[in-house]
């Protein structure tokens, strides 16, 4: 039996078809939700990525897990879910965004420097197989390295498509009980980046949440960003759907996001706020 844990970035819980968002197209997640338990009141352990990822992997919140600053690495001796499942006979694998290794705080957050950081084996959280990247927010043409790729190698295409395809191939090759994390950067900014052929809708056609101030610059900015945001959600939903269709039907699937995005709700943007759109 296998366990698949899909982790996305900045995908708020409200932005799904099954959650009654009128703007979004998520047929694969909608189908999964019908067959699943939906934890409607679950919130992130922290509304910023590294802190949430460290807590999700270790079960220990910040600062107790020693990830105190945005650029703090997960300590090499931190015990994660991978260690526990290794001990119980599972073969553990991680694909995608790590965001818990040492990186240059002065480098551009969006770009190749963080994307090409090599995560040393002792800093991969105990996963027996690893193929991913530190950060960089390269939603297209990601750089991957790990167990089979000693140096960062660029793959052409949409990040979610590439990671889901490579995770699927690994899963299909496994005969042992397995645990696989697929960690995707989408739908994190930059929202204007290509969304695997999904064309953004016209911003003016979008229905904003009731708590977004009406006729204002905030509403205009929210519409512009949401057009790209929803395109990336649709593209990521499609990649996830292909992955789920490829793997054994008895797989236990967990889907979550490390945090959401305000998108103009209460006049605010991005994450880090103690509001529903940011924490759930």
PLM segments and residue spans:
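Loop/turn elements at helix/coil->beta-strand transitions in domains of secreted/extracellular proteins
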Residues: 1-3, 37-40, 88-91, 128, ...
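Active-site segment of extracytoplasmic enzymes that catalyze sulfate/phosphate-ester chemistry
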Residues: 5-6, 12-93, 104
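Generic enzyme active-site microenvironment
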Residues: 7, 95, 256
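Active-site-proximal cap/lid insertion segments
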Residues: 10-23, 135-142, 146-161, 168-280
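Short amphipathic alpha-helical segments and helix-helix/interface helices
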Residues: 29, 79-82, 120, 171, ...
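Short Gly/Pro-enriched turn/cap motifs at secondary-structure boundaries
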Residues: 34, 45, 121, 133-135, ...
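Acidic, His- and aromatic-enriched active-site or binding-groove loops in soluble protein domains
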Residues: 110-135
């Amino acid at each position: 039996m296998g366990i698949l844990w899909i982790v996305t970035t900045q995908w708020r819980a409200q932005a799904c078809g099954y959650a009654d968002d009128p703007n979004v197209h998520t047929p694969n997640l909608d189908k999964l939700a019908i067959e699943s338990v939906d934890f409607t009141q679950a919130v992130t352990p922290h509304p910023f990525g590294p802190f949430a990822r460290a807590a999700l992997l270790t079960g220990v919140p910040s600062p107790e897990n020693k990830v105190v600053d945005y650029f703090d690495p997960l300590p090499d001796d931190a015990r994660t879910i991978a260690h526990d499942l290794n001990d119980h006979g599972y073969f553990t694998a991680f694909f995608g965004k790590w965001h818990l290794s040492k990186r240059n705080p002065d480098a551009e957050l969006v770009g190749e420097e963080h994307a090409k950081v090599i995560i040393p084996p002792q800093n991969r959280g105990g996963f027996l197989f690893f193929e991913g990247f530190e950060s960089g927010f390269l939603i297209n043409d990601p750089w991957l390295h790990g167990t089979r790729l000693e140096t960062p190698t660029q793959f052409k295409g949409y990040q979610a498509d590439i990671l889901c395809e490579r995770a699927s191939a690994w899963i299909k090759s496994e005969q042992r009980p397995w645990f696989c994390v697929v960690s995707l950067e989408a739908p994190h900014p930059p929202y204007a980046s290509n969304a695997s052929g999904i064309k953004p809708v016209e911003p003016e056609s979008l229905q904003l949440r009731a708590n977004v101030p009406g006729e204002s610059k905030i509403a205009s900015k929210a519409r512009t960003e949401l057009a790209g945001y929803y395109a990336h959600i649709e593209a990521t939903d499609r990649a996830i759907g292909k992955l789920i269709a490829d793997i054994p039907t008895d797989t236990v699937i967990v889907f979550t996001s490390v945090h959401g995005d305000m998108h103009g709700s209460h006049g605010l943007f991005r994450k880090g706020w103690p509001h529903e759109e940011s924490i759930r």
